[in-house]
């Protein structure tokens, strides 16, 4: 959170709770199926939440696909043949160690228990901790755990009228495999050659044992992934390139660099497909551990194309005509969580400062200082009152601006309260149509962060906003 006092940003430990409350109050995020009691760690995105999500996806797609000549897009199926997941290794090794408290019978991930205990007690190596030392987070009893057992995290479904092995399929736990099985299709149809990438966004599903931390860890989530195919031997250089590019994307969209760090996965904890993985982490301020993963950038080598070649019998190698050689491309994968990114952008933008009120004093003001490219609403048109002359003029202006941007119209309550509402959802510009507008055909445009106001001719409003909302 940014709380401004004499120009200095001061961190607050309550920022995360404030953002969660704001999300629920202002229609960013709602509990799923709330009228029926809800589903644990499942969330619906309201009017402002869905706009913010779409804006983040749009900026990711522009940065990763449309602004580059070496990356193309794909939209693969959520349900893939079972054989895909056998070949990828997910059926065999996509497991987490699950243990059960003998007192309250709550099941939890053993590694999460160790990591939480290590963070609480300042222990460097979580693996050195025996479960006998760990208290149950649910009931408080110490050391009463079953032996950890592997638990497969993929969600099963059956296609067809009979629930037997022939109809067994899985909801994808990652979007990556849909890209790998389409490698040759894209290679030939898009006329690409390594180094090049295939990107996609979409829903994935994991039967998480311990979901939580609001929208951070859920069983249904949205990914933004790209698989970048390179010649073996160039993979380490490309890996570092994508670590740098992806980190810069977050800071370009307003994340404070001090709230980001890189986490290098220890070799003994690498995923089954990875030669090296570096996470971009954000300082969320979670209980027990401040940091959480935003994005993982992995060097998957030729693991995926090699396995799919062997299991399918199809040759997925690339023939380099210029050098007269054939090879299986290595893969560099930047994989970001969309809702985790949304959460980070909101936490980083959350600000409390002071604003003058109508009585000559000051009130506390909550502001989401989002980059305008991400703001759910780009401008709000606010007639000073519901006067029969002002409202039509204001509505006409709002309709004109909606041809270009997502624009709100609000004529309820005092103008100061309407400003506060727009500040809370991150609207960069408020446009007031007042009684002077009837005479001079001009409006007052207020800027969110500085609260500075400028008089602009009503026929120049689009031009004015166009210069301020570049890239939106």
Curated annotation (Swiss-Prot):
Enzyme Commission number(s) of this protein: 6.1.1.14
Gene3D superfamilies: Anticodon-binding domain (3.40.50.800), Bira Bifunctional Protein, Domain 2 (3.30.930.10)
Gene Ontology CC, one term: cytoplasm
Primary residence: cytoplasm
Alphabetic keyword roster: Aminoacyl-tRNA synthetase, ATP-binding, Cytoplasm, Ligase, Nucleotide-binding, Protein biosynthesis
Signal peptide positions (record): none
Organism superkingdom: Bacteria
Catalysed reactions, as listed in the record: tRNA(Gly) + glycine + ATP = glycyl-tRNA(Gly) + AMP + diphosphate
Compartments (UniProt record): Cytoplasm
Gene Ontology MF term list: ATP binding; glycine-tRNA ligase activity; protein dimerization activity
Ligand binding (ATP): 206-208, 216-221, 293-294, 337-340
Known function: Catalyzes the attachment of glycine to tRNA(Gly).
Assembly and interaction partners: Homodimer.
Protein's name in the database: Glycine--tRNA ligase
């Amino acid at each position: 959170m940014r709380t401004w006092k004499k120009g200095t940003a001061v961190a607050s430990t309550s920022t995360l709770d404030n953002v969660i409350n704001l999300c629920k109050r202002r229609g960013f995020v709602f509990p799923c199926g709330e009228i029926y009691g809800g589903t644990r760690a499942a969330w619906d995105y309201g009017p402002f939440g869905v706009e913010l999500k779409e804006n983040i996806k749009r900026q990711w797609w522009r940065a990763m696909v449309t602004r580059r000549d070496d990356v193309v897009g794909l939209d693969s199926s959520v349900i893939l043949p079972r054989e895909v997941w056998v070949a990828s290794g997910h059926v065999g090794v996509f497991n987490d160690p699950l243990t059960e408290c003998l007192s309250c019978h709550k099941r939890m991930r053993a590694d999460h228990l160790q990591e939480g205990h290590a963070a609480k007690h300042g222990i460097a190596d979580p693996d050195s901790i025996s479960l006998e030392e760990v208290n149950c987070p649910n009931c408080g009893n110490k050391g009463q755990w079953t032996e950890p057992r592997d638990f497969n995290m993929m969600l099963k479904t059956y296609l067809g009228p009979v629930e037997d092995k022939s109809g067994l399929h899985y909801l994808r736990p990652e979007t990556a495999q849909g890209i790998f099985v389409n490698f040759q299709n894209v290679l030939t149809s898009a006329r690409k050659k390594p180094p090049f990438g295939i990107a996609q966004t979409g829903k994935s599903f994991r039967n998480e044992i311990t979901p939580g931390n609001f929208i951070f860890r859920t069983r249904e989530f949205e990914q933004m992934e790209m698989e970048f195919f390179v010649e073996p031997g160039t993979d380490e250089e490309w890996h570092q390139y994508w670590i740098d590019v992806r980190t810069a994307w977050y800071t370009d969209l307003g994340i404070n660099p001090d709230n980001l760090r890189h986490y290098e996965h220890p070799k003994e904890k690498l995923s089954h497909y990875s030669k090296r993985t570096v996470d971009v982490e954000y300082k969320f301020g979670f209980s027990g551990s401040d940091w959480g993963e935003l994005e993982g950038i992995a060097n998957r080598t030729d693991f995926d194309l090699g396995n799919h070649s062997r299991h399918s019998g199809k040759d997925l190698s690339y023939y380099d005509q210029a050098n007269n050689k054939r090879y299986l491309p290595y893969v560099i994968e930047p994989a970001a969580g969309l809702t985790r990114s949304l959460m980070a952008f909101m936490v980083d933008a959350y600000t409390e400062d002071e604003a003058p009120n109508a009585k000559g004093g000051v009130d506390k003001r909550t502001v989401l200082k989002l980059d305008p490219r991400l703001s759910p609403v780009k401008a709000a048109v606010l007639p000073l009152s519901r006067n029969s002359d002002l409202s039509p003029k204001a509505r006409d202006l709002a309709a004109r601006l909606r041809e270009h941007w997502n624009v709100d119209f609000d004529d309820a309550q005092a103008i100061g309260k309407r400003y506060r509402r727009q500040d809370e959802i991150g609207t960069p510009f408020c446009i007031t149509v007042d009684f002077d507008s009837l005479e001079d055909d001009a409006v007052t445009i207020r800027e969110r962060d500085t609260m500075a106001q400028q008089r602009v001719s009503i026929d120049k409003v689009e031009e004015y906003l166009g210069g301020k909302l570049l890239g939106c």
